[in-house]
């Protein structure tokens, strides 16, 4: 416990935060996988959506097992970092293999399906222990938010890399005659995305050496609890059930929003691919700027209220563009700004909210089950992405989207606009209901919980006064 009480050093915090660059792969996937498969690789829109959805669905289920394995690891090197090291190399390699145009005839779909599935399996194998490790750097309510703020800033640097930089690099290679249209994608992804993922993933692994529970701390965990019992016990905790439901619903809307943004810019607003990609730059800058206000909102009003405020921001932006009617670059910029503000605050506070549940679990069960919490949270996120990407593909197919034509019908343009504005708002509104009624951890009752937990561990008298509602 002594290790947990310590606040992570600045170097550890920065090194850990840099590991979020691994999410470059996730952002590249979200922004360009469907676009690459449909317009470059020649895969049908519905098939592309299915490949993405199936890969995310299988990987989401896999993250449950990774969470359980990580929580129960008895490695002398730690519970998180050995798994991170094992997964980072294949994650980077598979990311490169996805964005290669192949022509295996009837086997082309199988190639992309297999590579996409393997990528996300290894990606989550890295990500679940990595995210879990963040909870073990400190138990301080506000310090956790600051850690997640840095992670989110780095995440949005990865948004710039996977959403904007890669497109400029690809365009530069194509204009220089390097690889043609398809080959330029391969080189751009390998150099600007896969390589940084590998380097910064290893930096996070190295910077957190000695910061995870090993030895006696592992021996303190309850014995004989199988994976089913472990996750059922976590889901019985109402605050976590609330944040798990939120993650599922919110990230469906978020995935649809991000995945449709390129289509919205290119086809509805009539922009070039490079110009449309600047929306990701806008959202990245907004996210970085919002890191400090997000911390202030969380500290002033609590993480739950900050999360609800964040979703209201996109509600206003999305409704404005939809009601006014999209007509130019500025409308996409409004969407990008709203997306950046909402997603920045949401990512910062939601992970920190999950971390805070660890102490509640420990008080009730004698084990924080951090990786189980992160695994379940990631499952909700992954299921949401699977559903979201599939919905994008099927909506485009249903509306009659023609990938070979730059001029789309009015019904297709209306479908893209609705998918970019109203659909995300509906999912965010539904997710807010779960948070409002189930997640009741506040700065005040969390402080009382931590105080009682410390007394309980030291064998002293303790009281549940101040956090009874959490039990």
What are the roles of these predicted feature ranges?
Residues 2-471:
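Membrane-embedded alpha-helical bundles of multi-pass transporters/translocases
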